[in-house]
Amino acid sequence: MEYNVEDLSPVKKKITITVPVEEVNAALAATIAVYQTSVNLSGFRKGKVPASIIEGRFRKEVYNEATQDLVNVHINEVVGSLDTQPASRIDFDGGQLERDKEFVYTISFEVMPVFEMPDYDGMEVEQEKPEVDENEVNAVLERIRTNLADVVTVAEHRPAKDGEIAVLDFAAYENGEPIAGVAADNFELNLGGNQALVDFEELVKRAVPGEATEGDVTFPEDFINPEFAGKTVTMKVTVHAVKERKLPELDDELAKKAGGFESFDKMRETVEQSYLESRTQLCKAQAQKTMVDSLLKTLDFPVPESMLEMYMDSLLAEKKDRLERQGKSLESLGKSPEELRDEVRPEAEHIARTQIFLVKAAQKEGVTVSEQEVDRQLQQIAMRSGQDFQTMKEHYTRTNMIFNLRDRMLADKAMEAIYEKAAIKEVPAKKEAAEAAE
């Protein structure tokens, strides 16, 4: 077997492999021999079927398997001899083996770019000093208070207000006919919580308990269900009750209910400590990002297109999820798939460049990720999503997602290694950051 390597670009290789006749015939003979041990044909003892009969009867299967086996052996041999590993799937072009003929085929794949690593030992990195924001702490305490509030029916005969809960029946109509799927009974609507369309909430706030009302409601143009986008329908509403939350006092009794704290002061102290730890991690993460971004500015290397496509797909999937949680869709943005991909391309390229740099830094630092560490990470993912660990591992392995997961874990370790070698300079929190937190 001979091969020739052609660099199509700094991150893509094409390899032409030439297989001599002797190796082609040997591969066919080996595959036929496997069939001879397992095939049962009338008139022949098992294992005694002549090779010519096997080749004639199972020609398609034999030649397909022989080709695949031979190509796989060569790919492992050729790729193993190179200084780099594929960063994409390996594309094969070459047809099928033919007996007594030389077999020539090509494989092509993308590789990680080659570049000189910058010196980052002792580089100065500014990191903001974490501070406790009393407004943020108070907001957490208010959320705890709200969660422990008693929900009671309002005795006063009046419409519901923002911050209260309306118990109601509703149904949508178009041209006097009910719209299937847009109706509910005894629905509890939290008013002022962006749970429903503004027009609908205003309609609800007009009715007192026991009263029915109706009015027009217009769905936004970017509504997630295109069937209703921009459409005006008639909503009929009957309010049954108005409920309000009776907030408990911020005292020791609340602290005990919230989590067994011995006092309110102890609960507040715990919330402050948790907030400070969160801010510390946030400040560290921002410093690490600034550090890597600074190093990336000194480097110029191309990104494999397959890697770029993968991150663009991921960013668009995240965008789709965010929009759907808001009752919208990608289509509602009024942009073509190409325009959407162009929008996320710069961010995807930055993520890819960061990943490439950190994986190379991991090699430089001798950082590795064990199979046990990958399994532990998969167990956490499975637990959070409520799925079976073994099923998830098989899915990650089958779809090659496990390699992406390992690289992300490797990148995280490399980030820590670079950070440990940096000269961290603690600076006061920026005023605009503090104001944004408020």
Curated annotation (Swiss-Prot):
PPIase FKBP-type domain: residues covered: 163-248
GO cellular component: cytoplasm
Primary location group: cytoplasm
InterPro entries, sorted: PPIase_dom_sf, Trig_fac, Trigger_fac_C, Trigger_fac_C_sf, Trigger_fac_ribosome-bd_bac, Trigger_fac_ribosome-bd_sf, Trigger_fact/SurA_dom_sf
Subcellular location: Cytoplasm
Reaction equation(s) it catalyzes: [protein]-peptidylproline (omega=180) = [protein]-peptidylproline (omega=0)
Domain of life: Bacteria
Family membership noted in the UniProt record: Belongs to the FKBP-type PPIase family. Tig subfamily.
HAMAP family: Trigger_factor_Tig
Protein name, UniProt field: Trigger factor
